[in-house]
């Protein structure tokens, strides 16, 4: 059976009685074949990341110095709100993309970003900051999730790890550069409004690129579904209920559920770094410029190293990169507590970034390995629900522990959780990607 005949048999749109030659040719999957749209989506994702980077150097200090938030748990409330909203939005973003098309969800996400910098600039109370982070969480959940899924759609199974490495490189390098820029601007002009003018430009450009230039990837999803079904001798239209996908991603499937817990702990670390590190460094009498550099080093290392780790997972597999990466993160956090001073903390921040880079794109690639194209968006949404709940869990846990026992104790507790997560991956997660098997296909 030829590809076009299989397409005609399995695609409802092709069952119209039209001759086989009249059926449009399916798009070709691959990074090289779709490099223009892939590069555009990387650029869009960079602007998505830059929106988060606006807050990483400045907002914890803003809460303490301008709004007089007395407790660390209160200061970290903006991270918890962001994480909770983003996690829930991730869940629906994948399902909405599967049902209504990826581009529509991407554009909608950018619309929620437009008011965010204005709310922070004009905020008379901390409640306005919380509202801004609710909108930012929706923006990130819709826009970043959809950009990830669209890249998975474009490249197909063989280069998925490299694709995720490139995607997260663009996003988190932008997070780092934005955090550095806002911190430097704040050190010269004040904590607001000047640092947040950048956000107005980021949101406007990201929206314009998404509306004008991004194309939907529905046909690429259909092409991969047909190819997988042809290889398996099954129907390409097989669907799985949301409840079933949620169960697989939460407890039933060892690969998907173990990836979900690792993602949650990974972002618990990131929530800690976002909300607590600037205050931890400030308490050690570091300058705002030094704090900006430290908040830059972690996501910058994370972003750059992902260029190698994503592709490396395509060659060596996913499991052990994830397990070792989680353990390295735990060791780096322990170093933050054991060491003191700008240079030792810089080394720990770099190590934390390397560990995160080993994990972050590899987890997404593992989800893509296991999930079928027809329910891939939903599976990514379930994974990102649990992963980004880590922001909320991390902010609450770190805030409560820091108020009760001090910031160093909070960081140490999270380091222990991270090491345990790496052990769980080593013991429970199966290998999801066997390069030699793909090469033989």
Regions found by a protein language model. Give the residues of each.
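Symmetry-related core transmembrane helices of the 12-TM Major Facilitator Superfamily/SLC fold
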Residues: 194-211, 411-426
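C-terminal ends and interior cores of transmembrane alpha-helices
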Residues: 111-124, 328-340
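Helix-loop boundary and gating motifs at the non-cytosolic
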Residues: 32-83, 257-258, 262, 266-284
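Cytoplasmic helix-loop-helix junction between adjacent transmembrane helices
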Residues: 132-172, 366
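Juxtamembrane intracellular "pre-TM" segments in multi-pass secondary transporters
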Residues: 15-35, 218-259, 441
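Helix-to-loop junctions at the C-terminal end of transmembrane segments
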Residues: 89-101, 186, 305-317, 402
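Residue-level signature of mid-helix packing/kink "hotspots" within the transmembrane helices
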Residues: 83-91, 176, 299-307, 391-392
């Amino acid at each position: 059976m030829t590809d076009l005949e299989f397409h005609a048999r399995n695609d409802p749109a092709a069952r119209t009685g039209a001759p086989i030659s009249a059926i449009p040719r399916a798009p070709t999957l691959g990074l090289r074949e779709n490099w223009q749209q892939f590069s555009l989506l990387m650029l869009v994702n960079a602007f998505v990341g830059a929106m988060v980077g606006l807050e990483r150097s400045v907002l914890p200090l803003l809460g303490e110095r301008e709004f007089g938030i007395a407790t660390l748990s209160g200061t970290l409330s903006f991270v918890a709100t962001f994480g909770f909203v983003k996690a829930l939005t991730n869940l629906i973003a994948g399902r909405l993309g599967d049902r209504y098309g990826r581009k529509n969800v991407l554009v909608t996400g950018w619309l929620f970003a437009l008011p965010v910098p204005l709310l922070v600039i004009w905020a008379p109370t901390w409640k306005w900051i919380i509202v801004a982070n609710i909108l930012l969480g929706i923006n990130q959940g819709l826009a970043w999730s959809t950009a990830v899924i669209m890249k998975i759609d474009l490249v197909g199974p063989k280069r998925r790890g490299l694709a995720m490495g490139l995607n997260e490189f663009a996003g988190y390098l932008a997070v780092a550069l934005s955090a550095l820029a806002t911190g430097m601007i704040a050190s010269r002009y004040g904590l607001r409004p000047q640092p947040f003018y950048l956000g107005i430009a980021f949101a406007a450009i990201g929206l314009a690129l998404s509306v004008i230039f991004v194309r939907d990837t529905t046909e690429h999803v259909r092409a991969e579904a047909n190819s997988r079904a042809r290889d398996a001798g099954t129907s390409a239209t097989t669907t799985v209920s949301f409840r079933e996908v949620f169960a697989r991603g939460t407890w039933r499937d060892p690969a998907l559920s173990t990836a979900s817990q690792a993602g949650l702990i990974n972002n618990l670390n990131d929530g800690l770094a976002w909300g607590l590190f600037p205050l931890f460094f400030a308490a050690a009498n570091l300058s705002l410029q030094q704090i900006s550099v430290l908040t830059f080093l972690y996501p910058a290392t994370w972003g750059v190293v992902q260029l190698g780790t994503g592709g490396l997972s395509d060659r060596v597999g996913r499991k052990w990169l994830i397990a070792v990466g989680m353990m390295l993160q735990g060791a780096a956090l322990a170093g933050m507590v054991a060491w003191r001073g700008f240079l030792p903390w810089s080394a720990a921040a770099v190590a934390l970034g390397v560990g995160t880079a080993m994990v972050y794109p590899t987890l997404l690639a593992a989800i893509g390995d296991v999930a079928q194209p027809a329910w891939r968006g939903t599976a990514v949404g379930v994974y990102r629900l649990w992963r980004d709940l880590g922001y909320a869990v991390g902010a609450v846990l770190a805030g409560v522990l820091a108020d009760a026992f001090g910031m160093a104790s909070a960081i140490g507790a999270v380091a222990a959780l991270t090491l345990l997560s790496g052990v769980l991956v080593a013991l429970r997660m199966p290998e999801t990607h066997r390069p030699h098997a793909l090469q033989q296909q």
